[in-house]
Amino acid sequence: MKERSTELVQGFRHSVPYINAHRGKTFVVMLGGEAIEHENFSSIVNDIGLLHSLGIRLVVVYGARPQIDSNLAQHHYEPVYHKHTRVTDARTLEMVKQAAGLLQLDITARLSMSLNNTPLQGAHINVVSGNFIIAQPLGVDDGVDYCHSGRIRRIDEEAIHRQLDNGAIVLLGPVAVSVTGESFNLTSEEVATQLAIKLKAEKMIGFCSSQGVTDSEGNIISELFPNDAQKRIEDLEQEGDYNSGTVRFLRGAVKACRSGVRRSHLLSYQEDGALVQELFSRDGIGTQIVMESAEQVRRATINDIGGILELIRPLEQQGILVRRSREQLEMEIDKFTIIERDNLTIACAALYPFPEEQIGEMACVAVHPDYRSSSRGEMLLKRVANQARQMGLKKLFVLTTRSIHWFQERGFTPAEVDVLPIQKQELYNYQRRSKILLADL
């Protein structure tokens, strides 16, 4: 019981910075028809209600692709696509309206009761839908008339902001009207993407059947830049995947990211609590598309001393690193390089140059326990080696008691004390007996 309580406390402590950071921000959440059909959908809705209770401004966009196809199949009506876009004739439009209307009522009801059976039971969630989007027809392409398939002409973002200011969740579907009063079938990814851009949303969030984008070995890729995401889209399309939740969301995420939306997140609709884990933990659980990485490798400043001390103290207590006082760190802070993730220092290293001997020491190498199985140490080594080359240094050495093989695997070879700069030879601790490893730059 005590262990569970400790986990709860630690989890809450780690989530508090994200609660504060997200409060008052606008998120656009895209719910594809596949996510709505899944048995975990009620949990997703409950988590959306939780986000609303934490002061996050929410616009929820829902799709209805499988529900529309099901309606068509029941009426023995074959869906028609041109260039992977549905052709919406008059009969299809009626089924689109029917599916979208039922989903709007269902999602509104679920959101309205999403805080039941929680400590916030009794809190009222106001869900608002309306004609915030004006549509226009796609027209004719290669002789094919898309009929009532449309695209966005304009968005009344001021009206949406007023609803968000009043504490409502704005719920929008795939049907919008034109200035002439006609109805058009839109794609949920276009609606979500354009809303995120026009509302200057902090995040756009989507769901797919997997936990995100995976590499060739099936591992989740936690972060993609737009160009990488575009390459992934092209790879999937070459495999014949044009309309999966992953591809549809990635297309929108690339556009949103390049248009100022800071982060777009792709999560699994099958994973219970994926939305909460992604937004309120440092490493998340899915894939995010970003213009700027959540992680930065940079030179340390005086403001980083607390984070560096917190990182290296456990290693000093274990005897792995030589102890450094706060005063010493303050004097030597310009020699340190850190890796920072969401304002947490997760790795550090220092470069001490000896210009006369054209050699440098890489020291105080530390990586947060949660990230030691990743490539952060290698990132620091490359950065420090580049700094040494820019200083005109020819060699780099390290003194280590534990990481001998790690450095040897990266080009360092064992050496004797006499290869060290004279100043360093005089300070060498023969009782500690650190191994000396040397690499050419």
UniProtKB/Swiss-Prot annotation:
Gene3D superfamilies: 3.40.630.30, Acetylglutamate kinase-like. It holds the Pfam family AA_kinase. Residues 295-434 form the N-acetyltransferase domain. Its EC number is 2.3.1.1. Keywords: Acyltransferase, Amino-acid biosynthesis, Arginine biosynthesis, Cytoplasm, Transferase. One of its GO terms (cellular component) is cytoplasm. The keyword Transferase applies. PROSITE patterns: GNAT (PS51186). It is found in: Cytoplasm. Pathway: Amino-acid biosynthesis; L-arginine biosynthesis; N(2)-acetyl-L-ornithine from L-glutamate: step 1/4. Its main location: cytoplasm. GO terms for molecular function: L-glutamate N-acetyltransferase activity. It catalyses: L-glutamate + acetyl-CoA = N-acetyl-L-glutamate + CoA + H(+). One of its GO terms (biological process) is L-arginine biosynthetic process. SUPFAM superfamilies: Acyl-CoA N-acyltransferases (Nat) (SSF55729), Carbamate kinase-like (SSF53633). Homohexamer. Belongs to the acetyltransferase family. ArgA subfamily. NCBIfam families: N-Ac-Glu-synth (TIGR01890), PRK05279.1 (NF003641). This is Amino-acid acetyltransferase. It comes from Yersinia enterocolitica serotype O:8 / biotype 1B (strain NCTC 13174 / 8081).
